[in-house]
Amino acid sequence: MQYAMYYEEQQQISQDEYGKMKQQILLREGERKFESYTLRKLKFTGNDADETVAHYYLCVKDQSEQQIYLEKKYMQNHIWHRACAKVTKKSCGQILRGEIDWMKNSKEALFRDFYLQATLNHLSPGRVIEYQREMLKCKDGYVMFNKKINCIVGGWGNLFWPEAMSIHCLDEDKVLVVYKKKVNLPNTIWEMMQGNTLLNEEKALVF
């Protein structure tokens, strides 16, 4: 399985600081523009206390059936490792209902991995968090502004319901800024660690 490997820093800032920081970034990055989108992430319950244990998520970008992803994420030696694969709406429903036998022999390594972990550790759908984000790919990494973070009421059954009730998790006068910087390794090291094919960074960090 191939992973995007990156360092991550995050901090809450005020609305005024957000406006100034965004303007400075746009001036520095030239013609690059921020992408605005909504992301809902459903976390599968497991050992939440240990960041070194991999966590799994179903992610829906802009409530689009064409942008549903299964995500695996864990931290090792202060470096985040992340893998993701596209999922159809039908397959997403099967995963949520625990109908995952089809993943056992899938060509997609992440599906096989999820099947194994879900079977061994009895993973089950947990809470859904919604993020309203702005993201920009910079010359040296990715900047994300989380303008709103809400916990969706009703659990996984409301993953695709746009009018679902929610509880605010971020103060209204605050913005959570996240910076991700890719770990740069020589191609030969990448190939030894992840196989002969280099990871498509754009795909791995699509949200």
Go through each PLM region and give its residues.
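Phosphate-end processing signature that detects enzymes handling 5′-triphosphorylated RNA
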Residues: M1-F207
